């Protein structure tokens, strides 16, 4: 059973929890409720305690706020956050002075942090899917000597799984390099421009990776900008394959096809990933690698797809212009597009079921 809060701690918690905006700045600073040039506010949502402050302009989980306070050697906030319920062992991830180590030990911290706890912290931060969470994760985890081999291996597996097809598995990859690519991919996927700018300022060799992320996450406007204006280019068929990693990437598939990419290769890549929307869009554009696609489907155990690809019921969509290269025109063309050949196979499957 946790010990009761001291009167001083309870008062601070009450003040931090109030919605009143008229409390004087000097009073808040005197009470230790001022952090990163803003009032420190506390609230509870679904049983989790969050901190509002000026840090990154976002709400932060109390346990994550503790990690930041420890990294900053803000001893008063370390004590306060721990008294409010932060898990003191999380402090071990960012301790960088003997004084902080001694203080956290006095507050009950263990000598080492379990891999499971580290993994929980990582997922807790990344769960928010914001620019701030990416920047925060970078500040806590990049080149952190506290990361042990077991956790590093676990994190590698997570990254390879989430970036399947976008990143090549190499045992020689540095964990820090993988983390940066993972965070950058997240920033592109969810349009977190602040995080993209943050990573671009710190790392100058991400142009090709950015191009690949734009392809994978169907970002046609950004792709057009980097490909034509900044001249960051790779083989067009490799681009088309990257566009087929995720399903329903019609914009970037069309864009790469209009640049001269092989639509049959795109069709086969889509079969490999079982991306049905992509497969039939490729057929709409003239793809006809039916036998090869059926063979790949059979090898992967996609039995219905294997059978459906050898049916003599498909043809290209004559209503699709094949020479558009301006993102606005492509977006307008495909905004409400319904695949002709996907409709054909759906009608066929309804008849036989």
UniProtKB/Swiss-Prot annotation:
<dbReference type="GO" id="GO:0042330">
    <property type="term" value="P:taxis"/>
</dbReference>
<comment type="function">
    <text>Plays a role in virus cell tropism, and may be required for efficient virus replication in macrophages.</text>
</comment>
<dbReference type="Pfam" id="PF01671">
    <property type="entry name" value="ASFV_360"/>
</dbReference>
<comment type="similarity">
    <text>Belongs to the asfivirus MGF 360 family.</text>
</comment>
<dbReference type="InterPro" id="IPR002595">
    <property type="entry name" value="ASFV_MGF360"/>
</dbReference>
<protein>
    <recommendedName>
        <fullName>Protein MGF 360-13L</fullName>
    </recommendedName>
</protein>
């Amino acid at each position: 059973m946790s010990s009761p809060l001291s009167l001083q701690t309870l008062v601070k918690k009450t003040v931090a929890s109030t919605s009143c905006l008229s409390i004087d700045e000097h009073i808040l600073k005197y009470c230790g409720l001022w952090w990163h040039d803003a009032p420190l506010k506390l609230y509870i949502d679904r049983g989790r305690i969050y901190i509002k402050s000026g840090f990154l302009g976002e709400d932060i989980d109390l346990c994550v706020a503790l990690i930041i306070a420890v990294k900053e050697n803000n001893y008063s906030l370390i004590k306060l956050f721990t008294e409010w319920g932060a898990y003191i062992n999380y402090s071990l991830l960012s301790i960088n002075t003997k004084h902080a180590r001694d203080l956290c030990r006095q507050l009950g911290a263990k000598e080492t942090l379990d891999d499971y706890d580290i993994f929980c912290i990582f997922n807790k931060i990344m769960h928010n899917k914001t620019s701030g969470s990416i920047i925060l994760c970078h500040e806590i985890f990049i080149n952190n000597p506290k990361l042990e081999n077991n956790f590093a291996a676990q994190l590698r597996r997570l990254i390879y799984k989430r970036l399947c097809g976008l990143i090549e598995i190499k045992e020689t990859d540095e964990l820090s390099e993988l983390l940066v690519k993972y965070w950058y991919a997240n920033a592109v996927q969810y349009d977190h421009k602040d995080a993209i700018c943050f990573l671009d300022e710190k790392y100058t060799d991400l142009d090709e990776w950015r191009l690949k992320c734009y392809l994978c996450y169907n970002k046609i406007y950004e792709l057009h900008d980097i490909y034509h204006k900044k001249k960051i280019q790779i083989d067009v068929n490799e681009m088309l394959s990257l566009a087929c990693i995720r399903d329903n990437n019609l914009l970037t598939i069309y864009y790469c096809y209009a640049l001269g990419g092989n639509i049959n290769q795109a069709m086969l890549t889509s079969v490999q990933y079982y991306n049905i929307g992509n497969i039939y869009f490729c057929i709409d554009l003239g793809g006809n690698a039916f036998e090869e696609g059926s063979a790949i489907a059979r090898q992967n155990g996609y039995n219905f797809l294997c059978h459906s690809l050898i049916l003599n019921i498909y043809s290209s969509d004559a209503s699709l212009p094949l020479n558009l290269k301006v993102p606005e025109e492509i977006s307008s063309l495909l905004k409400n597009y319904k695949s002709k050949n996907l409709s054909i196979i759906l009608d066929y499957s309804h008849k036989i079921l």
